[in-house]
């Protein structure tokens, strides 16, 4: 058997210092996960795809394309492909509106989620908003405070 059985898509949280990946099925259940210290800050543009493939290569089928949805510093100016910040408030992106880096491996359909920014008070998020959206999708009645510490 080639690849991870029931793999539907791959979630990626790619920060400055760490890379984390999750294999997901069609119901968004986690099938497997991995991580490395190959954060955006350790790579040049040519290094992103190889770093990702070191973690997910064994999950991919021999043929076909797998959606890979990435958030975090991977979408910064210094990242794999720039996904410019979106001003808030904003509506969710429609399918196909995320940044797409070029890939050599034809099995990868990588999309990078943009960060969010507000002017008053000035602040930005790149990756955290995606994690919050995931929590709210699973717990729509959540009423509390979230603390998502990063490495900088």
PLM ranges: what are they?
Residues 9-47:
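Short glycine-rich, Thr/Ser-proximal phosphate-binding strand/loop in the N-terminal lobe
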Residues 12-18, 73, 148-152:
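A short acidic Gly-Thr/Ser loop motif
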Residues 2-6, 107-145:
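Conserved phosphate-binding catalytic cores of ATP/NTP-utilizing and phosphoryl-transfer enzymes
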Residues 9-13, 67-69, 144-148:
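Short glycine-aspartate micro-motif
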Residues 27, 52-53, 66-69:
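Non-catalytic, solvent-exposed interaction/assembly segments
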Residues 59-125:
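Short beta-strand-loop/turn "lid" adjacent to the catalytic site in phosphate-handling enzymes
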Residues 46-59:
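Short, well-ordered amphipathic alpha-helical segments that serve as non-catalytic structural scaffolds
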Residues 26-29, 61-62, 137-145:
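Secondary-structure boundary elements
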């Amino acid at each position: 058997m080639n690849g991870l059985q029931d793999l539907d898509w791959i979630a990626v949280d790619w920060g400055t210092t760490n890379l984390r990946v999750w294999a997901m099925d069609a119901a968004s259940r986690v099938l497997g996960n991995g991580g490395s210290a190959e954060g955006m800050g350790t790579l040049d543009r040519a290094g992103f795809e190889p770093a990702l493939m070191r973690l997910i290569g064994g999950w991919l089928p021999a043929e076909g394309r797998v959606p890979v949805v990435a958030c975090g510093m991977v979408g910064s100016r210094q990242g794999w492909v720039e996904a410019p910040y979106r001003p808030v408030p904003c509506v969710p992106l429609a399918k196909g509106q995320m940044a797409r880096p070029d890939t050599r491996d034809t099995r990868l359909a990588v999309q990078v989620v943009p960060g969010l920014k507000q002017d008053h008070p000035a602040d930005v998020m790149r990756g955290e908003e995606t994690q919050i959206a995931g929590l709210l999708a699973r717990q729509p009645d959540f009423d509390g405070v979230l603390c998502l510490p990063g490495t900088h």
